[in-house]
């Protein structure tokens, strides 16, 4: 038997991932509903955004994946195995340890924790003795995959011919499906589904916190002047603005040209920080337990 690699649509290999609004509850809920109906692409792209845009999700998920990847492992023969079979298992274990970076392989497969599944494409080649051996394990983006519409249980490769995609080539893939709950299809088992709303709420809070800082953290500069020429007044205003962000004012009057720095207006931004902390605590509980 000659192992084969999957023929992947070159257009899909050059496909650019879409990015989805991180402040729209309706958009995110629609993506999750589409995945329940068997359309996984948009959800997969959202999950990738979550990993890349939220440092807390990235850090906590990395902790969990590293904890799995660093575990010791071994191959055990069947209890009824004879001496020859036991020796074959020992030889296979030595071959795997000498040939493959299992820690990296397991770390890559652990992406299934968040996404619900992970598929690594195998590239085969012959070794020095002529035996076929896997040469590389290439993690493929989860947006490349779909499920059959009849059962929504069988992971398949997307193509341009059918919404069911095409079957994965035998011996061409290592597929790990992770179950974050007791029932469901591969597209609904990812832990990131539970993190989508905390991720959304944190984005709300972060953007509002940045607006708060912009409004209340910049001193206000006020210049009282007696200049009548509009051109000169505009030049003075530009000079003030060049001193920093636009917390400036140009007012006519006063006894002399006088630059005043006014203390920033008081405000309370703790509510935004509390929401951010709650979202991060929820994420940590979901990923690491607690």
Model-derived regions: residue spans:
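Structured, contiguous alpha/beta core segments that scaffold functional sites
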Residues: 2-50, 58, 83-249, 254
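Extended, low-complexity, charged intrinsically disordered regions
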Residues: 63-67
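Solvent-exposed, flexible loop/coil residues
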Residues: 79, 141, 263-266
């Amino acid at each position: 038997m000659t192992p084969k690699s999957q023929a992947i649509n070159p257009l899909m290999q050059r496909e650019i991932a879409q990015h989805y609004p991180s402040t729209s509850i309706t958009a995110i809920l629609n993506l999750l509903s589409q995945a329940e109906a068997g359309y996984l692409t948009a959800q997969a792209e959202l999950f990738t955004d979550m990993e890349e845009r939220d440092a807390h999700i990235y850090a906590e998920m990395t902790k969990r994946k590293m904890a799995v990847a660093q575990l010791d492992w071994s191959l055990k023969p069947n209890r009824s195995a004879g001496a020859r079979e036991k020796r074959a298992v020992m030889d296979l274990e030595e071959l795997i340890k000498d040939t493959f970076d299992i820690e990296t392989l397991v770390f890559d497969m652990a992406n299934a924790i968040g996404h619900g599944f992970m598929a690594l494409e195998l590239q085969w080649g012959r070794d020095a003795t002529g035996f076929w051996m896997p040469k590389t394990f290439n993690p493929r983006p989860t947006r490349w995959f779909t499920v059959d519409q009849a059962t929504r249980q069988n992971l398949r490769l997307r193509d341009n011919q059918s919404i069911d995609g095409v079957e994965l080539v035998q011996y061409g893939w290592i597929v790990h499906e992770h179950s974050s709950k007791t029932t469901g299809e591969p597209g609904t088992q990812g832990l990131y589904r539970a993190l989508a709303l905390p991720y959304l709420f944190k984005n709300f809070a972060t953007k509002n916190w940045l607006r708060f800082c912009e409004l209340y953290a910049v001193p206000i500069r006020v210049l009282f002047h007696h200049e009548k020429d509009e051109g000169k007044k505009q030049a003075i205003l530009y000079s003030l603005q060049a001193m920093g962000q636009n917390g400036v004012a140009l007012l006519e009057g006063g006894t002399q040209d006088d630059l005043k720095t006014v203390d920033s207006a008081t405000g309370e931004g703790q509510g935004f920080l509390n929401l951010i902390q709650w979202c991060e605590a929820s994420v940590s509980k979901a990923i690491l337990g607690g």
